Every structure is written in C-alpha cells, then in structure tokens.
C-alpha cells in the first residue's frame, strides 16, 4: 500500500463500509508515508420498518437457527462461517464468482446447487427472480448503501414477502464527498 501512495499528497479511502481491515491498512500506510488521509462515508440506507437488525453475522445466524425457510446470504464469503450451524440445505450464499468465494461455501459444506456465484450490484428484478427461484424466506445483507444495491434488495424482499435481516454498519468517523472535494481543491 505504501508504494501506491508514493508521490501522493492525499488519499481518499472510499472502501466498503464493512471493509474495516482494508481501512486500517490504508490508514496505517498513510501514517507511514505522511500522506493526508480522508475516509469517505457512504450515506446509510433508510432501513425498511420490518427489517431485523443485528450487530454481527454470528447474532443473525443464531437468530436464524430457530426459524424455518431458505436463507439468501448476501453478506460476502468472509461472513459464511458464522452460518455453519444452520441446516446447510437452507443456505443460499450469493458470493463473488471467484475460487475464494466458492471455497468459502465449500468450507461450510454448502451444496454446489445452492451457490449463487455472481458479481453485483443487482437490479430489483434480478433480486426478485433469485428470491422466487430459490423459494427464499430470509435475506441477510449488509447496508452497503446505494452503491451496494441495498435498496434493490430491500424492495425485492418487500415485493416477495421475504424477511430482511441487516448487519449493522461498523461505527466510523469520516467525511462527505463535498468536504473531501473541497480539501482537494485547496491542495490544487
């Protein structure tokens, strides 16, 4: 990361709100190189009234252990181990179409026929089709904001009468696009 910052005077960290490890690495590299660091905050989504919010994937998984119905996991491959104690036939993870994504599914013994390997974000219509095709009753997601297709997932859940479970964003400090652009103008 420090090599990428060579010659830069400012670094804008616009990583996913849940990419805490990447943010830490970027911040440390900026400190090491003396590059000015700014964290861009994505606007949080307005959560639908009937959504269920948990702090962690483990809490969501524990809740889902006592429910019935198929579960679409759109939280990413790194969160899959939290759901390993749920009847695996109920789990339908939507992961990136990479070896790492597939291996993460295999590590918790998800049947290949249940793996949805696609790269998003996804339209409202595609989300609806997936919910209907796999008879999903629960969708677990992170609030990735508009960039992450959160509202399309939420609207598809509403349309298909699927319960929406949201993993709360990590608390962080940051800035708006406007304030970061203003700082960039000052540096010109």
Predicted regions and their residues:
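Short acidic active-site motifs
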Residues: 1, 59-60, 79-82, 100-101, ...
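Glycine/small-residue-rich loop that forms an oxyanion/phosphate-binding "nest" at active or ligand-binding sites
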Residues: 2-60
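Structural motif
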Residues: 9-10, 70, 137-138
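Short secondary-structure boundary segments
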Residues: 15, 95, 142-144, 168-170
């Amino acid at each position: 990361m420090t090599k990428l910052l060579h010659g830069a005077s400012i670094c804008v960290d616009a990583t996913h709100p849940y990419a805490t490890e990447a943010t830490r690495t970027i911040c440390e590299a900026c400190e090491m190189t003396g590059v000015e660091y700014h964290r861009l905050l994505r606007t949080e989504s307005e959560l639908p009234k009937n959504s269920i919010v948990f702090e962690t994937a483990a809490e969501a998984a524990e809740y889902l252990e006592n429910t019935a119905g198929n579960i679409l996991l759109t939280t990413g491959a790194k969160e899959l181990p939290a759901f390993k104690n749920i009847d695996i036939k109920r789990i339908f993870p939507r992961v990136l179409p990479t070896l790492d994504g597939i291996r993460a599914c295999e590590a918790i013994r998800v049947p290949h026929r249940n793996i949805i390997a696609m790269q998003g974000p996804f339209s409202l219509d595609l989300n609806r089709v997936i919910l209907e095709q796999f008879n999903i009753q629960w969708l677990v997601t992170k609030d990735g904001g508009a960039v992450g297709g959160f509202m399309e997932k939420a609207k598809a859940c509403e349309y298909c009468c699927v319960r929406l479970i949201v993993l709360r964003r990590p608390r962080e400090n940051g800035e708006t696009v406007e304030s970061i652009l203003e700082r960039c103008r000052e540096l010109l």
